[in-house]
Amino acid sequence: MNKCPFYLLVFPALILSLTGCSNIQPKANPAYDYVAEGRGTWLSTKMETDWDSTMAVLSKAGFNMVFPFMCSAGSARYPSKILPMVGQRDELTLCLQAAHKYGIEVHALVVPWKLESGPDSVQKRMMEEGRTQFGYDGKPYSQVALQFGYRQNYETLCPSREDNRKLLYDYVMELAKNYDVDGINFDHFRFSFEPLCYCNNCKENFIKESGLKITKWPDDVWKDGPYREAYLDWRRELMISSVREITKAIHDYNPYICTSLCARRQLKVTYEIDAQEWWKWIREGLLDFVAPMDYSDEPEEYVHLIKQQFPLIKGALPYYGGVGVFRMKEFEPVKKAIELGRGIGEDGYVTFNINSLLPLLEQFKAAGVNSLPALLPHRAPETRFYVESSGRESEEGFKIFAPGSEVNFKVDVMFKAKLRQGISRIWGDVVLTKTSGEIVAKIKSFDLNEATIANLSVTCGEEGLYRLAFYGTMTLSNGDVRPFITKSFPFEISSS
């Protein structure tokens, strides 16, 4: 048995024994007619939307996911028994009908703590009940935001209060149970600024749970205070514990529904200030894919951000980079960012936002940015890859092997996926690909009817970035047959 101290967790995936290469026969397998890629866009508008025409143009441009804002802690864009409804229409139903008509998944965007778009009466009641966040100096969230240059006319609930956590649980589960969503995409699942939160509830809970003797609040936990690090740890645990509660409830209710996150890009800031240690959330299996908000003006900066984040993920789940179309504005830099992201091994992209994207869609089609139909990586069968140690690793977390080296793997194939049906059969081809998508070699074909663990190996001569892939077909328990493609975390062949 090979020692495998490092593993590639291939998000919904399947790869089997690899021992030698043979010529590719693409037409023998329907999966070769596709690529594996999530192509999405965030729709942050809170106005009425022409959902049918929007989904029609997105579909024609090759998009397969949308992330529409649907609710916050203060309002919902659909009828709710828990949240006040804004607008006159059930926007979520209209969105789902249109998106599913065109084969597009809907991952409803949920903002957990902010009372955004909510009526003044709700804001007032929450503040009177002491349920909102307060800064170090006792100022409410809206005034703290002003200090950082943000004019926000709403308050934010404190996640240390059980009634606020129950509110989040209740309205998210109401959405999951009442609507046929494909996923729930969390945004702002964090604190927004460093001086938050220092309310009385945070004080009482921190003292109780830490067992520390606090003599000067909040000075003891602020800046150079003796218990600052303990308080930051407590804030991070406060946030992840809430994520655990709600994602477990969603997955227990309906395993098909994906949970995902609009992750913050600045790793130090999100760790210390936001209390959003999202890479730990990934390691605990709380998310089904992640979409870091890697907004930048230049394509090269976009890829630089990806390189910083890759070592924290290492293929544990699909990575869909957040492309800031609103900042790049023109088509060419957006196109280049997507191409560079593909080249380094991201699994797809999500653009921000729809208003900036729509004027570019004709150019998307003309340039063939999404020319091949795409299969969603997060809907493929699940597999874990265990890769032997090479002794070298790049800054992106890629294992580095010398040209001509034999790379040994162990693969754990599981007959489960984020689907509405179970899986009864999986068959297809294991191939070696470049990160650009070019298939280098077909390695072996398999036909399985049960979970399998296999040892495998492959030899690569030419320098470059590679991914193992399974181009396959799965038979579901209801008889449906679906193609899928799944890929490993990249590895590098290099003589340097």
Report each predicted region and the residues it spans.
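Aromatic- and acidic-residue-enriched segments that line the glycan-binding/catalytic groove
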Residues: 79-86, 114-150, 188-222
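Glycoside hydrolase catalytic-domain groove-lining segments
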Residues: 209-330
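The substrate-binding groove and active-site-proximal loops of carbohydrate-active enzymes
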Residues: 39-47, 79-89, 151-166, 227-239, ...
